[in-house]
Amino acid sequence: MYAIIETGGKQFRVKSGDIVKIEKLNIEPGQEVIFDKVLLFKGNEGLKIGNPYIEGVKVKAEVIDEKKDKKVLVYSPPSKKAIHKLKGHRQWYTKIKIKEIVGG
């Protein structure tokens, strides 16, 4: 049994027990979060596809941690002058553990 959820403008295929890195949520570690934007659900009865979301199916997860990801370097080469620009960016993410998929 698995589901495809949407959060933070991205889609993730999850099943019970998975650990997933998603965009930052403003929720403390240890708290429960419920995702109701389920795009697809595959269970024992078959496949359900939402239009755009499936009503009655929710994914329960627990927030494990909130950290910064690895640094991404952005380099701007010089145009006509010898001015180099090198910048770094570290994106915040939230690590969650999927508890169960309810409904379906």
From Swiss-Prot:
One of its GO terms (cellular component) is ribonucleoprotein complex. This protein binds to 23S rRNA in the presence of protein L20. Keywords: Ribonucleoprotein, Ribosomal protein, RNA-binding, rRNA-binding. InterPro entries: bL21-like, bL21-like_sf, Ribosomal_bL21. One of its GO terms (biological process) is translation. GO terms for molecular function: rRNA binding; structural constituent of ribosome. This is Large ribosomal subunit protein bL21. SUPFAM superfamilies: L21p-like (SSF141091). Belongs to the bacterial ribosomal protein bL21 family. Part of the 50S ribosomal subunit. Contacts protein L20. Coiled coil: none annotated. It comes from Thermodesulfovibrio yellowstonii (strain ATCC 51303 / DSM 11347 / YP87). Pfam families: Ribosomal_L21p.
